[in-house]
A protein has these predicted regions:
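Glycine-rich phosphate-binding loop of ATP-dependent small-molecule kinases
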Residues: 1-190
Length: 190
């Protein structure tokens, strides 16, 4: 089972991915986590990515595509994977399809967790205040920019997957359990 999870920052993609990982024994491929790890390690890629992410902008397609291609061929992806935070642009979606076709892999479902902006701001603020571990991008100014970038760059990707009859939209303003149940309903058709 190969899935893509979409949703604006703070929509709960990571939480839902964790549930799916445990239920289906698949792995999560999070470009955000991969990039944060590079930043933490202080690699050249990490330094470049940090300067871009600190502004709330997207890291270049070339960097992300290269990371994903290397990751997707690892043995732990054989049972399936969830892409979280990728693809974010139409070019990335097309490049992903090209990579997957070359590897004889396909995406089964694309799930969008839909949440409105006010709800996101409240959720992210709560996450930042209630956590001992803070993320540099958990503040309202950066979040607002990330939402603008998400809408501008990512919404055309949703249309792309809708045209391929792979997109399923879930109400992300429900509690975690109900969002998960709605996702499970979509996946029962696999």
């Amino acid at each position: 089972m190969n899935l893509i999870l979409f949703g604006p920052p703070g929509a709960g993609k990571g939480t839902q991915a964790e549930i799916l990982i445990n239920k289906y024994n698949i792995i999560q491929i999070s470009t955000g986590d991969m990039l944060r790890e590079e930043v933490k390690l202080g690699t050249e890629l990490g330094k470049t990515a940090k300067s871009i992410m600190d502004k709330g902008d997207l890291v270049s397609d070339e960097i992300i595509i290269s990371m994903i291609e290397k990751r997707i061929i690892k043995p732990d992806c054989k049972n399936g994977f969830i892409l979280d935070g990728f693809p974010r642009t139409l070019k990335q979606a097309i490049d992903l399809d090209n990579i997957l076709n070359k590897l004889d892999i396909h995406i089964d479902k694309v799930i969008e967790i839909n949440v409105d902006e006010d709800f996101l701001l409240k959720r992210i603020t709560k996450r930042a205040l209630g956590s001992k571990i803070t993320r540099d991008d958990d503040n309202s100014e950066i979040l607002k920019n990330r939402i603008v970038v998400y809408k501008k760059d990512t919404l055309p990707v949703l249309e792309y997957y809708k045209n391929l009859n792979k997109l399923h939209t879930i109400d992300g303003m429900q509690n975690i359990e109900d969002v998960s149940k709605d996702i499970q309903k979509v996946l029962t058709w696999l």
